[in-house]
């Protein structure tokens, strides 16, 4: 199925690219989320008419993500207190939601879907550098310090 991308999508293409994708990917992900439209003559004409508007919107989103990345990088270590045993092993874990809530409480909006924990949740006390992906092109690192509750 041929589609026109309305957003930059990792490993697929940029705004305005006509790409061929599997029908299920288009029908279940790209089209419902508004990231693409079916590539037919009428949609191509509509897209070309709206191209400048869509590019301006993408540029504004990128600028906002860069601003948030600067704020996140400027943050001191975000402290999360959790119950832990004698050897620093947590009773439970610190996950995406906990990190996002702590960063939001520190003054920078962060959604749990933007937090990247490739090795899974944090299960020990200590200092960690957690990557956050604010935009397809913008990544930042937030310092998280997990301490034992008194």
Swiss-Prot record:
GO terms for biological process: translation. GO terms for cellular component: ribonucleoprotein complex; ribosome. SUPFAM superfamilies: L9 N-domain-like, Ribosomal protein L9 C-domain. Pfam families: Ribosomal_L9_C, Ribosomal_L9_N. One of its GO terms (molecular function) is rRNA binding. Keywords: Ribonucleoprotein, Ribosomal protein, RNA-binding, rRNA-binding. Binds to the 23S rRNA. Belongs to the bacterial ribosomal protein bL9 family. This is Large ribosomal subunit protein bL9. It comes from Shewanella baltica (strain OS185). The lineage of its organism: Bacteria, Pseudomonadati, Pseudomonadota, Gammaproteobacteria, Alteromonadales. The gene is rplI.
């Amino acid at each position: 199925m041929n589609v026109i991308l309305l957003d930059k999508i990792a490993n697929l293409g940029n705004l305005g690219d006509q790409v061929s994708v599997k029908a299920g990917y288009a029908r279940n992900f790209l089209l419902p989320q508004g990231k693409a439209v079916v590539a037919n003559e009428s949609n191509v004409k509509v897209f070309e008419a709206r191209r400048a508007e869509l590019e301006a919107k993408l540029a504004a989103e990128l600028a906002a993500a860069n601003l948030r990345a600067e704020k996140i990088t400027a943050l001191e270590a975000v402290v999360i207190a959790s119950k832990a045993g004698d050897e620093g092993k947590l009773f439970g874990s610190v996950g995406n939601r906990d990190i996002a809530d702590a960063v939001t409480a520190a003054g920078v909006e962060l959604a749990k879907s933007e937090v990247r924990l490739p090795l899974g949740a944090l299960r020990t006390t200590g200092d960690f550098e957690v990557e956050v992906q604010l935009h397809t092109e913008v990544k930042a690192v937030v310092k998280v310090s997990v301490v034992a509750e008194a």
